[in-house]
Amino acid sequence: MLNTFNCIVMNSNFTGSVVIITGAASGMGREMALQLAGHHDCRILALDIREKDLQETNSLAGVHSDKIEIHVLDVAQADMINAFAASVLPTLNSKKLILINNAGVALASGRFVDTPAEAFEWLLNVNLHGVIRMTRAFLPYMLQTNQGHIINLSSVFGLAGVESNTAYCTSKFGNRGFTESLRMELIDTNIRTTCVHPGGIKTNITNFSVAAGTRISKEAHQESKDRFAKAARTTAGSAAKQILHCVETGKQRLVIGSDGKFLDGITRLFPVSYTKVVVGLMHKSFGNPYAKK
């Protein structure tokens, strides 16, 4: 599997560093771990809540599996993050730390008024507060060593708000604002930040999405997942390669995919009226769950 990746050269900004990747059991997180293991001399800490899938990530690395250390961790649990940080920080030995906050979940709940408060808060706890917790745990070390890189995964839904995704959009706009604020705070240091806005990526995030609320049936949920799978245009491997390249170039903002670039452009040109265009595209791509049958 690793020989299919055409990554950047071995002698790079990753050389001798420690890379922490959340959400490394599948999708872009797994691909980043595998590409790093196959092409870079660095220590990789792969984190996820799903232990079996983490073990598969390690196994897929083949002869490079010794570079990947797997750790079961739920970014929604502050105690787990604090315990993980307490065990890892003493082992870093002033090496450059690269933190990739990739873990995320999706929610199929319908409109905001139909979304249970506990489901909304669950998603924010993972997608937004998980990023904040991980950054809070490891940024002091970066400041102490005056080096490092924080990569936070937002989304095209952190560029454009869309219906029936109020929780997800809130979390991804939050990640964007958090990352951009950090960029300003760290401008006089050697610590870099990157905010990533992927478009449709061929990953399992919709397969692990949670259906909640009173307006989303199992059939509608499955139809939405099937439509997303067809509409997703970028492979996880391609997205991972672009994200890792940001560490080499110092790029601070990355929009992935032609669909992502389209949304980025239209929201810049038409910051209010883009809504009508996006609604039409969303209904065409994913269907209109509120249309009368």
PLM feature spans:
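Conserved glycine-rich Rossmann-like NAD(P)H-binding loop of the short-chain dehydrogenase/reductase
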Residues: 41-55
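Residue(s) in the substrate-gating loop at a strand-loop-helix junction
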Residues: 155
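Conserved glycine-rich cofactor-binding loop
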Residues: 18, 25-26
